Amino acid sequence: MKKYIAEMIGTMVLVLMGCGSAVFAGGLADTVGAGVGTIGVALAFGLSVVAMAYAIGGISGCHINPAITLGVFLTGRMNGKDAGMYMIFQVIGAIIGSAILFALVSTGAHDRPTATGSNGFGDGEMLQAFIAEAVFTFIFVLVVLGSTDPKKGAGNLAGLAIGLTLVLVHIVCIPITGTSVNPARSIAPALFQGGEALSQLWLFIIAPFVGAALSAVVWNYLGDKK
């Protein structure tokens, strides 16, 4: 049970810090003058992963992302029961993080599109968004699988490599979708945002899972002993 709780806490921190930076960099920047820009948001997500990797990595492996859990499961590193429980607790943690963030922004008159840090895409941009989310999730999860491989991995540097990769992914993908590469990170804000964020949510669940599955296939080949 401890590893499930660890995943819940880690995902809560990721959503609160990452989406929180997006909210206060975008939706509230004009009113409080605290905008940090794309680089700042990217760093917030990446540094959250680094921090949690060294905080809970020894307990749960610090997936804090259903796409990563799927990749780990498909490479035979965890069983189906644990994979399912990880995903459930990740979503719960994300909802808690979004609830805290929603409470913070709803205390004032901040009715902005970025009020919860939800993901989305514009008219005619669905294919672009799907490709971006699938490709960048593929890259991200491949780095996770490679850097955490028991024999070929980066050891204690894995957390840093994973966090920096997430920073790079956000820098490129934020202008396209706001960057998800993490179904839990998208589900929770969409539940509080509603409307278009909820109607477009399917893409931010399916595309990351497609990318994660492809990364598992590739790593099963690359990491094969033969």
Located regions from the model:
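Membrane-interface helix-loop junctions and terminal tails of multi-pass membrane proteins
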Residues: 1-226
